[in-house]
């Protein structure tokens, strides 16, 4: 499964960035290739026009009980013999579409990769749905009756050995939780927090059902869910990694890196509609440091997991103004400026995403959700100059209610070294892993971008959002952009091609994925598809060069923010572990929900140009491309 560069990390196209160079506090990097343990891609995605199982409702008004009942009835209609439970993360998106998630069960245990997401339209009817429910035979024997499976300690030992995690288990013991066959481990060293284990079923790649222990281990560089066979205690059937790799003197929003403009002093930069407590309060306490409701930023030179007592600048008069020079060395000499920049960029992005629909109910990152739904206690831990690696960055996204964790590294490809916190595109790329992981499959499920193609799209969304945000006033359809060029000191950036609407400059299409088996390379293809979409919508609606969108009837009035909004809404519509064809359909459906399909032509043309037109197909062994625009699209 996902190592640092294979999930949530910003990597170079040809393995220029291998792995961070060192670790701290005894947390060892495993040597096993987690990529080989990815869960397989098996979801279906169907919109209302394709569905023969549309469920009408006569309820009024649109209430939580009614849309959950509508969604539940659809699942019963589609798979009448399945047993399942409602996941408690349903909500109504800013586009008026309600999202409800279900988990299949067998003998009272979760089938952990059998998910069903239902999207209910504003009219109370099914808008679209996706699922990966198991349709084979459920074992007759209830494992909880016979109880001949291995114990959780054996499962943890088996996980430790199979993945070479270097966890010390000499004093290990278990403590039962309130959930069925669920345990916390005590007396363990080598992990950030106590490991956990829960007995669940898993649909294997061959389509059969296996009883497994789901073992959760946060070893800092990787935050793993390992599905280990409950009968043998040794065979690993799958692994999920949550890590995808006042006055502020900063590079202002829209300046991607120091080559694009000077630092300026910005006063009270927060959007009060998105950050009700400002950036330096959490609703309970007011701070004079880089800490607040949305994030807590600090230095982390040792690369450790502790952060509350780490150094952060303190300004009683709230003047976060610190010196920084491109020639300054060593990096710790400008740590105050680095922390301030990271805090500013992450908070600004939080506020922008909030206005585009990534709010409390959708699973955003906030300590206090102010009574607006979702699970709180999950601001983003922002580590500047993190000592656990170099030439990279990463973001860990656990489910809603647990803090996200971003690590920004020093880049050593230049003299003097460069600090990744000063390249906004890297910060935005990493934070977008949190966005896409929380929205896809619902806030309570952070393992829905784990398959190779969906994981690649996770990287692509990060590149796309970073690029859309850095557009300049004079840019046109023919403007090209690179990724990570400043930090890596690499002309042309860290992807194989610039993002471009020219097939000569960037020849990548959907069938290029047939030759790719690494998520960053796959992501570069997806990001360029979205770059085509971005410019088609800008050409139609114009471009707002301001720091936040303007809306009319809930729809961004310009093409740039409209593209970002449709991409975000599509994440919430698509199934768990989607492929590119399904993600395309979800974006089309997002436009249908938001604008009644007013941009269908522009969207189809963008996808068709890059091989994702009508008739494009995903298969596990190959992709089939198409440049066809549907006859009714334009």
From Swiss-Prot:
One of its GO terms (molecular function) is metalloendopeptidase activity. Its cofactor is Zn(2+). Residues 1-18 form the signal peptide. Keywords: Glycoprotein, Hydrolase, Metal-binding, Metalloprotease, Protease, Secreted, Signal, Zinc, Zymogen. Binds 1 zinc ion per subunit. Residues 289-310 are annotated as: Disordered. Induction: Expression is controlled by the prtT transcription factor. The active site is at 430. Secreted metalloproteinase that allows assimilation of proteinaceous substrates. Belongs to the peptidase M36 family. This is Extracellular metalloproteinase NpI. It comes from Aspergillus oryzae (strain ATCC 42149 / RIB 40) (Yellow koji mold).
